């Protein structure tokens, strides 16, 4: 809030612990007009990290257990009304969509199939280089996917260094899901 943001998406690795901490210990005590949404950064076995946002009230313990193949993750997320997209698709050496697949003789047809099923792409990651982020933006444009920006705050200095501009009427996960499904571009 002090940095001028109206809200945030908490997406820990394979866990909702950060969101639960906010919900159980912080919610309603400070900044009651600050929106906090729940997500997860899921570690797939074959395509690196995926950002997942589910409608409020949907509880899938499966999303806190790492290791599903990306295709199964996409199917489960969509079945329960959520959205999914690759985090830092060209970033981190072994934990990104493109670099993970490069080690496994990734074929353009498989990338196309996955990209058609994703709902968005993280196109700006504050902990990645401009070159890597530009490649992610090109990937999103090529497949006409909305882009998210994220701090990926594994380091204190990354907190609040990136954002995604969203309408003020997004107050819950379902609002965000509906919005992402309705647009082809999101302003960073």
Language model segments and positions:
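Divalent metal-dependent hydrolysis catalytic cores, especially in the metallo-beta-lactamase
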Residues: 1-17, 83-85
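Charged catalytic cores and adjacent phosphate/nucleic-acid-binding surfaces used
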Residues: 3-5, 17-26, 30, 44-60, ...
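Hydrophobic faces of well-ordered beta-strands that scaffold small-molecule active sites
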Residues: 8-9, 36-40, 84-86, 121, ...
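Acidic/polar N-terminal loop/beta-strand segments that form early-domain functional surfaces
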Residues: 10-14, 24-25, 39-41
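Short, well-ordered beta-to-alpha junction loops that form the rim of enzyme active sites
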Residues: 13, 87-90, 153
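Metal-cofactor-binding active-site regions of metalloenzymes
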Residues: 32-48, 82
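Short loop/turn segments at strand-loop or loop-helix junctions that form parts
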Residues: 41, 55, 87-90
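Internal catalytic-core helix/loop-beta-alpha segment
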Residues: 66-106
């Amino acid at each position: 809030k002090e940095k001028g943001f109206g809200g945030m998406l908490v997406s820990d690795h394979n866990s909702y612990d950060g969101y639960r901490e906010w919900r159980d210990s912080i919610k309603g005590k400070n900044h009651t007009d600050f929106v906090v949404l729940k997500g997860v950064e899921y570690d797939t076995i074959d395509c690196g990290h995926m950002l997942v946002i589910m409608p409020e009230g949907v509880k899938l313990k499966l999303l806190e257990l790492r290791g599903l193949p990306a295709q199964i993750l996409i199917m489960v997320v969509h079945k329960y009304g959520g959205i999914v997209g690759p985090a830092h698709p060209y970033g981190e050496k072994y934990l990104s969509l493109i670099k993970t697949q490069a080690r496994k003789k990734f074929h353009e047809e498989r990338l196309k199939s996955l990209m058609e099923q994703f709902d968005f792409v993280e196109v700006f990651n504050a902990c990645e280089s401009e070159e890597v982020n530009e490649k992610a933006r090109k990937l999103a444009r090529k497949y006409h996917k909305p882009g998210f920006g994220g701090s990926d705050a594994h380091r204190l200095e990354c907190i609040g260094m990136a954002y995604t501009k969203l309408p003020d009427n997004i107050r819950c996960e379902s609002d965000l899901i509906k919005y992402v499904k309705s647009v082809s571009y999101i302003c960073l």
